[in-house]
Amino acid sequence: MFTMKKSLLLLFFLGTISLSLCEEERSADEDDGEKGVKRGIFSLIKTAAKFVGKNLLKQAGKAGVEHLACKANNQC
């Protein structure tokens, strides 16, 4: 009976250690996942800002050229 208790105690101890190691790895993996998501969101925002900025500059450039042509022809 005593040897059975020892072996069960040993199995419980080893199981507890392996479980704690798995939890540490899982939390480390979750941290990496959050960094990846943050990078993904940042790159998406950055790309959208570039697109909007280019379109605004094109529109401003067209308006500026039209305004200069208007001034040059004195039709404003």
Swiss-Prot record:
Subcellular location field: Secreted
Signal peptide: 1-22
Propeptide: 23-39
Gene Ontology biological process terms, A to Z: defense response to bacterium; defense response to fungus; innate immune response; killing of cells of another organism
Record InterPro entries: Antimicrobial_frog_2, Frog_antimicrobial_propeptide
Listed GO CC annotations: extracellular region
Tissue-specific expression: Expressed by the skin glands.
Function statement: Antimicrobial peptide with activity against Gram-positive and Gram-negative bacteria and against fungi. Has been tested against S.aureus (MIC=1.25 ug/mL), B.pumilus (MIC=2.5 ug/mL), B.cereus (MIC=7.5 ug/mL), E.coli (MIC=12.5 ug/mL), B.dysenteriae (MIC=7.5 ug/mL), A.cacoaceticus (MIC=12.5 ug/mL), P.aeruginosa (MIC=50.0 ug/mL) and C.albicans (MIC=2.5 ug/mL). Also shows a weak hemolytic activity.
Family: Belongs to the frog skin active peptide (FSAP) family. Esculentin subfamily.
Official protein name in the record: Esculentin-2-ALb
